[in-house]
């Protein structure tokens, strides 16, 4: 499916060195920015709406970054929020941003696949995560293990297009030395279905890629 043996360390290096730049992507919410980067705001809206649909859910945010989405889901009613990211600079930013929620949140610098996490969680967020994973099926399987019955995974996934694909390839892989992976609708249905999720809802709101809700029976 995806192949890049050096991918994890290359991704880790990029997010350690450019934590502030990634955080700034969410800073500007002017109309022009929303028009040029609609995917950032659509996936945040899906995460918030999903959390709001549960009664005080426990939320796990995999690849939580600087806590931008965490702030919104805590405001939306998450009873407890756990953010995990392997970039210490990102977690430092998240800790500062979410300080006012200190009694309801926990932040970990760790590898999701091996981290000790106290589940289950009603909502698991994987927003802006699968873009960088050479072995995504390992993540979907662990998410199933940590997901509560009737719980939900919310994810975002880039897809190849001739409009944005070449630009992202140059920006991330050639200039930034950071791998980037794309997905098809069928690939997502098979991966999450094989992990045990049912139903798997794949939404295609625009050119920026797919949004997903996958439920644990």
Model-derived features: where do they sit?
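Conserved class I S-adenosyl-L-methionine
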Residues: 1-52
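Short, glycine-/aromatic-enriched active-site segment of Class I SAM-dependent methyltransferases
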Residues: 159-179
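A conserved beta-strand element that flanks and buttresses the S-adenosyl-L-methionine
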Residues: 125
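Class I SAM-dependent methyltransferase SAM/SAH-binding core
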Residues: 66-113
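Short catalytic micro-motifs in class I SAM-dependent methyltransferases
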Residues: 128-129
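A short glycine-rich, Lys/Arg-flanked "PGG" loop and its adjoining helix->strand segment in the class I
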Residues: 137-149
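Conserved beta-strand signature within the Rossmann-like core of class I S-adenosyl-L-methionine
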Residues: 150-157
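Short alpha-helix
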Residues: 179-195
């Amino acid at each position: 499916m995806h192949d890049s043996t050096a991918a994890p360390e290359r991704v880790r290096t990029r997010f350690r060195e450019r934590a502030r730049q990634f955080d700034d992507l969410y800073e500007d919410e002017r109309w022009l920015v929303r028009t040029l980067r609609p995917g950032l705001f659509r996936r945040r809206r899906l995460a918030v709406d999903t959390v709001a649909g549960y009664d005080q859910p426990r939320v796990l945010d995999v690849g939580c970054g600087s806590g931008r989405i965490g702030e919104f889901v805590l405001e939306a009613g998450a009873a407890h929020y756990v953010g995990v990211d392997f970039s210490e600079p990102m977690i430092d930013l998240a800790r500062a941003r979410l300080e006012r929620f200190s009694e309801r949140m926990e932040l970990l610098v760790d590898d999701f696949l091996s981290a000790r996490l106290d589940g289950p969680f009603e909502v698991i967020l994987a927003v802006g995560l699968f873009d960088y994973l050479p072995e995504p099926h390992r993540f979907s399987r662990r998410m199933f293990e940590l997901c509560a019955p009737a719980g939900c995974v919310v994810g975002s996934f880039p897809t190849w297009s001739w409009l944005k694909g070449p630009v992202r390839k140059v920006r991330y892989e050639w200039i930034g030395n950071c791998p980037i992976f794309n997905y098809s609708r069928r690939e997502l249905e098979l991966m999450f279905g094989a992990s045990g999720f049912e139903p798997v809802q794949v939404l295609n709101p625009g050119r920026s890629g797919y949004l997903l809700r996958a439920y644990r029976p």
